[in-house]
Amino acid sequence: YRPCGAALERAPGASIAERGEAVVLPAYRGQRLLERMTERLTQEAQTLGLDGVFAQPVTVHTFSQHNDARAGMAACALALGVRPEQATPKGAPVPTAGQRQSLLLMFNFLRTPAARHIYAPTQYHEILRKIYQALGADLSFAAPATELTGQSGVAIKMEKSGVGDIRFTKIGVGVAVELRQICSDLLDFGVKSLRLSAPLGDPGVPVLVDAARACGFFFSGVAPCFEDGADALLMQYLVEPLDIDKLQIYADQTKELAAFIAGDRIELADKNSGK
């Protein structure tokens, strides 16, 4: 048997890969095996010519997050309630008990990233600047579209974990009506949370964000290079209560991102409740 294990996972043709969760048996801990595996996988990703690597550490503890930060990764998104409550390490303390489990999205560019010129609503400019600064990428904002044209392109998927994924590849003139109908259909199927993504290079992003917020979606983060090599904006909608303060978060930059998401969620809830 092996005392540890880790792997790079990449979709066919993708320019990025996920560094899968590394596992070290208890008897072999304290020998820097986790750090050495991480370094080896980063070297392999560079050999493959990838643009970057990402990881999705849990928030029930900070061990994986600590390793990701040591490897130069920055937090770019927080996915709340995307795993069942029982999806926790066996035999470990569970400070997040009583709610579905959440994951971080950590990312590291393996080469100097090109400057980003994106479309985003003004209320998200500051947090987006901070995320891209942490990632080491220059950022500028484009003027929003005066009007949308054509039809939307959207893909919908329901995961066994109870998450409904809504992926816009193009934002068209009917996006607000389309999104409301999609959300209604997925909620009727009993999903526990909804995830929304759209390419930040689409001029219709501010319109989509307005429509999404009207449906109850709040900011979740950015997925660099996830949209056929381009970056995607991420938003979320939760069906069940979730206390962000229960999440175990290691780095100050990650805590700042989580605080913004918590604030955006509260602001949206107050607005939609008429407060």
Model-assigned labels for residue ranges:
Residues 45-59, 67, 189-199:
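Conserved GNAT acetyl-CoA-binding A-motif
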Residues 24-26, 30-47, 52-55, 175-184:
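Conserved acetyl-CoA-binding loop-helix of GNAT-fold acetyltransferases
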Residues 119-149, 248-275:
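Short, cationic low-complexity segments
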Residues 54-56, 72-95, 218-230:
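Conserved catalytic-core motifs of GNAT/GCN5-like acyltransferases
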Residues 1-5, 100, 229:
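Glycine-rich acetyl-CoA-binding "A-motif" of GNAT/NAT acetyltransferases
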Residues 1-27, 154-165, 169-175, 183-184, ...:
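A conserved beta-strand-loop-helix scaffold within acyl/acetyltransferase catalytic domains
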Residues 1-5, 207-210, 215:
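Conserved beta-hairpin
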